[in-house]
């Protein structure tokens, strides 16, 4: 199995199996890419067309993944990872899919993963969206954390889930970028992916969103410098799984969220 020469801008190096997967995929070595997964792996990918929050296309098992990749065929893309965090067998990352010929970003992607005991990929849940700009390294180039990002995220989620919209928006810097998957109601953020620039825009968007009877629950998180990656699930008020999401947050020098990007799918993909 060949390893990848893929570079990671921020955070941790990719696990060997994930680096090999991207390297093989980018090199159109599709059987080699499938070999990076465990026998019973869950491979959940965004649809080729439609809305980015649409249900994932789920394939189970290395053999079926190999068949799927063979049908997929070669693509003119390369993966560039802008932020990666790994803790034990769990991880999450954000990156860009770039055009192999021009080097220009074509889309942003995010993923969560769980590794098997032998280091192969046991669960891979991916998301894609239009390019989210700026990248984490541009939002805050410092390597020093001004606060504990997960605490600020919890503060934000609790306020949002309790419909305290000004308190939720106060967790963000005045010049924040907030990039969110398409809302069901286009009155909140328009059609397609929603981006709000600045706290005032974000506060107004939270009010348009209104009260929703859901609960955000974080199942993995890790911070590197001022940058955080997390995986979460959304439950309804009865505790049933509705959706899965990955979010990236970058703090400013005052410990407020200067950049927040999230990716979501419904229904959720259970963890192992």
Task: Go through each PLM region and give its residues.
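Short N-terminal micro-motifs specific to bacterial/archaeal maturation
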Residues: 8, 24, 55-56, 112, ...
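A solvent-exposed, acidic/Ser-Thr-rich amphipathic alpha-helical stretch
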Residues: 11, 30-89, 171-224
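Disordered low-complexity repeat/linker domains
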Residues: 29-30, 49, 121, 164-165, ...
């Amino acid at each position: 199995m060949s390893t990848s020469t893929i570079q990671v801008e921020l955070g941790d190096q990719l696990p060997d199996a994930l680096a090999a997967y991207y390297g093989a995929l980018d090199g159109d070595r599709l059987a080699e890419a499938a070999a990076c997964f465990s026998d019973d792996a869950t491979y959940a990918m965004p649809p080729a067309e439609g809305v980015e929050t649409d249900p994932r296309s789920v394939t189970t098992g290395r053999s079926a993944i190999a068949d799927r990749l063979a049908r997929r065929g070669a693509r003119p893309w390369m993966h560039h990872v802008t932020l990666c965090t790994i803790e034990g067998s769990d991880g999450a990352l954000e990156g860009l899919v770039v055009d192999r010929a021009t080097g220009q970003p074509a889309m942003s992607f995010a993923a969560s993963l769980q590794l098997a005991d032998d280091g192969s990929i046991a669960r891979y849940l991916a998301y894609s969206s239009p390019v989210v700009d700026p990248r984490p390294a541009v939002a805050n180039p410092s390597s020093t954390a001004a606060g504990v990002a997960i605490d600020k995220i919890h503060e934000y989620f609790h306020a949002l889930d309790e419909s305290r919209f000004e308190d939720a928006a106060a967790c963000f810097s005045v010049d924040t970028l907030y990039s969110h998957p398409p809302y069901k109601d286009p009155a909140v953020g328009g059609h397609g992916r929603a981006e709000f620039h600045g706290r005032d825009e974000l506060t107004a968007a939270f009010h348009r969103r209104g009260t929703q009877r859901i609960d955000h629950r974080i199942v993995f998180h890790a911070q590197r410098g001022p940058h955080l990656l997390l995986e979460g699930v959304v439950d309804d008020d009865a505790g049933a799984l509705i959706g899965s999401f990955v979010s990236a947050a970058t703090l400013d020098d005052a410990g407020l969220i200067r950049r927040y990007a999230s990716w979501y799918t419904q229904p959720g993909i259970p963890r192992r």
